[in-house]
Amino acid sequence: MDIKINVKNLKKVMSQLGRLNQDLEVPFQEVVKGGGQLIRAEAVKSIQSGGKSGIVYEKYNPRRSHRASAPGQAPASDTGNLVSKIRVKQKDKNTTQVESGADYSAYLEYGTSKMLPRPFLFPAFEKSRGKIAKAVFERVKTAINRIAKWVIMLQHYNKQFSML
């Protein structure tokens, strides 16, 4: 028993698959930019909201009470400086960097010899990672579906003319 498989227009199909990389360049760049903004938004949200359970301090200039975050929690917002210094920078078309320009950012993120970490950027990345991966998957799926529709249309077109 023999089974023959004949792929018509293989060169055209392979050409379309070869375009997949080119077709995905702009959507991937959109995901990179949007992913950076998503990470920044998560970091800001973690600092500005959520119950903090650290020590309450009396602060001066201006006079106020401030509840600090406990070790392991995102830092508690006090003056808004930390949040205002979180930036998204486009390094090149495929790389976005989320960074905090506050002088004390690294001390909060990683801790010091006298203070345990109050991370805010890495947890924001971890929380955003699934959404970013899903956005990449959706764009790949859309591009592949577009090629699949083209291949089906090509097959239908070939059947139409082979019947004549």
Regions from the language model: what does each represent?
Residues 1-164:
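Short, Lys/Arg-rich flexible segments
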